[in-house]
C-alpha cells in the first residue's frame, strides 16, 4: 500500500532519545546530534541568550 495510509507507519519509532551529555530527550537518532545541547554536532555546548527566562519574565545569563 502507498500514499496516505502508509504515512501512519512512519512515526512508530522514536525520533529523539535521551542525550548522553545533557540528559534531555533531544538526541536525534537519525541525524546523530542533540537538538538541546548540540552533542554530536559540536564540542561546545549549544547555548543562546534567548533560551532561559526567569519566572518574572527577565532573561538570565
UniProtKB/Swiss-Prot annotation:
Family, similarity comment: Belongs to the eukaryotic ribosomal protein eL37 family.
GO biological process: translation
Cellular component terms per the entry's GO annotation: ribonucleoprotein complex; ribosome
Zinc finger boundaries on the chain: C4-type: 19-37
Biological function: Binds to the 23S rRNA.
Keyword annotations: Metal-binding, Ribonucleoprotein, Ribosomal protein, RNA-binding, rRNA-binding, Zinc, Zinc-finger
CC cofactor note: Binds 1 zinc ion per subunit.
Protein name: Large ribosomal subunit protein eL37
Molecular function GO terms recorded: rRNA binding; structural constituent of ribosome; zinc ion binding
Organism, scientific name: Saccharolobus islandicus (strain Y.N.15.51 / Yellowstone #2)
Positions of Zn(2+) binding: 19, 22, 34, 37
Cofactor(s) in the UniProt record: Zn(2+)
NCBIfam families: PRK04179.1 (NF003214)
